[in-house]
């Protein structure tokens, strides 16, 4: 009888495929709560982009050069917007997030240059407004995604105070690294939300398309969690200074 032995890392990675992945199910902005984009039950009142991710799956590194990396697979802009004042904080709550899916949490914003309901994911130019990666430890360490779980599967992001009024798309993303030690193993979970930003200043970001954010061999994408390490290079562009 042939016997196979798997490492702890391999077992964790395999187990993760059976875990339920999540999506942003609730958006709180300026005292209002909006429904997120449920992949199985679209809600016309949601400012979240509806994508073809009914498997609650991910965008893999081989697709990072396609529009799927912007707002998930074949994402479509909704007519609704969440209203938020520049400088205030938005709370994004996921319906669930697996404990095995350690990794960074990143937030971007892109101007729609008009109404966001007619925007396409591939045409948006984003700037990064927040990022958080490794917090402490290694093998696998404590990560931003773990902090999200500790906070009731929620994450807060502050809209830049100097952002010019207008309509924008907020891109919120977790990159799960539990399989990222293997080529094409990282898992990106981008979520997009239409915003109408009020108040603020006069800064309008120029940004870049999401297809230029990451490459499959970036050190923060091809990264082995299950080893000793002192730091983690957060992928993507630098945080926008305004």
Curated annotation (Swiss-Prot):
O2 binds at residues 178, 187. Its main location: secreted. Its EC number is 1.14.99.56. Lignocellulose is the most abundant polymeric composite on Earth and is a recalcitrant but promising renewable substrate for industrial biotechnology applications. Together with cellobiose dehydrogenases (CDHs) an enzymatic system capable of oxidative cellulose cleavage is formed, which increases the efficiency of cellulases and put LPMOs at focus of biofuel research. The keyword Metal-binding applies. It is found in: Secreted. Binds 1 copper ion per subunit. Keywords: Carbohydrate metabolism, Cellulose degradation, Copper, Disulfide bond, Metal-binding, Monooxygenase, Oxidoreductase, Polysaccharide degradation, Secreted, Signal. It comes from the Eukaryota. One of its GO terms (molecular function) is monooxygenase activity. Its cofactor is Cu(2+). Disulfide bonds join 71-192, 112-116. InterPro entries: AA9, AA9_LPMO. Cu(2+) binds at residues 21, 101, 189. Residues 1-20 form the signal peptide. GO terms for biological process: cellulose catabolic process. Contains a small loop in a region where a large loop has been proposed to govern specificity towards oligosaccharides. The presence of the small loop leads to a considerably flatter and more open surface that is likely to enable the broad specificity of the enzyme. Lytic polysaccharide monooxygenase (LPMO) that depolymerizes crystalline and amorphous polysaccharides via the oxidation of scissile alpha- or beta-(1-4)-glycosidic bonds, yielding C1 or C4 oxidation products. Catalysis by LPMOs requires the reduction of the active-site copper from Cu(II) to Cu(I) by a reducing agent and H(2)O(2) or O(2) as a cosubstrate. Active on hemicelluloses, including xylan, glucomannan, and xyloglucan. Shows clear activity on cellooligosaccharides, generating C4 oxidation products. Belongs to the polysaccharide monooxygenase AA9 family. This is AA9 family lytic polysaccharide monooxygenase F. It comes from Malbranchea cinnamomea.
């Amino acid at each position: 009888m042939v016997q196979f032995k798997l490492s702890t890392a391999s077992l964790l990675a395999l187990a993760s495929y059976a875990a339920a992945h999540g999506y942003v199910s609730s958006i709180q902005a300026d005292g209002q709560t909006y429904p997120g984009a449920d992949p199985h039950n679209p809600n016309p009142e949601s400012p979240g982009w509806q994508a073809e991710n009914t498997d609650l799956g991910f965008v893999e590194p081989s697709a990072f050069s396609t529009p799927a990396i912007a707002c998930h697979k074949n994402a479509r802009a909704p007519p609704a917007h969440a209203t938020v004042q520049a400088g205030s904080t938005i709370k994004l709550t996921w319906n669930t997030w697996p404990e095995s899916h350690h990794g960074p949490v990143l937030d971007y914003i892109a101007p729609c240059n008009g109404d966001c309901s007619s925007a396409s994911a591939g045409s948006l130019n984003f700037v990064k407004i927040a990022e958080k990666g490794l917090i402490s430890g290694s093998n696998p360490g404590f990560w931003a995604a773990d902090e999200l779980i500790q906070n009731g599967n929620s994450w807060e992001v502050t809209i830049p105070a100097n952002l010019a009024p207008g309509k924008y798309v907020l891109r919120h993303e977790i990159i799960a690294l539990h399989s990222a030690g293997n080529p094409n193993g990282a898992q990106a979970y981008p979520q997009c939300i239409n915003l109408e930003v009020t108040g603020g200043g006069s800064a309008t970001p120029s940004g870049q398309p999401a297809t230029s954010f990451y490459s499959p061999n970036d050190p923060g994408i091809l990264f082995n969690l299950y080893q000793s390490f002192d730091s983690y290079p957060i992928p993507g562009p630098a945080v926008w200074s305004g």
